[in-house]
Amino acid sequence: MAKIGIFGGTFDPFHQGHLKIAVEAAKKLDKVIIVPTICDYYRPDSRKLFTFDEKVAIITKMISNAPGNIVIDSLEKDKDSMWRTINTVQYFKEQYPNDELYLIIGEDSYKNFPTWFRYEDILLMATLMVVQRGNSKDDLVKVVPCEELYIGKDFLEASSSKVRNKLISELMEMYLDDADWYNKF
């Protein structure tokens, strides 16, 4: 029986922190499947920086030098906004019926996990693998049973929103420089 990790997220954009999580999880699991999602249920009005296809291209490029047991699956590309984590877990349970599934989520998502749609059913099909960062392995307050993936205090403190804001700022600066915008006033 293989251990299969499902690592889903909006990944807008996918960054070095996400890659580190996938690499660390791949050390404990037989396979890690990165699953970019179509929408963010907790921030439905959030601004999108990249299209789904662009996110897939970025992830594919970033995992090209990662261990071979890290792959990407774009199953959510053609799904509507009603597609949820439970649907993704069910899909992979059908693909890997005799294997053990792990749903890889961050500590922030884990704290809200009991509010997820059909979270009890998710737990029947998959073990949660919670990415824990910080100074101590004992910091995680358990809200539901889970396995911990301790990244450590030297974990790259990156977030998609920080990366997105930096990209937008740099792109805007490039645009303004190219357009000679400042000299028009």
Give short role names for the model-derived ranges.
Residues 1-185:
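Nucleotidyltransferase catalytic core that binds NTPs
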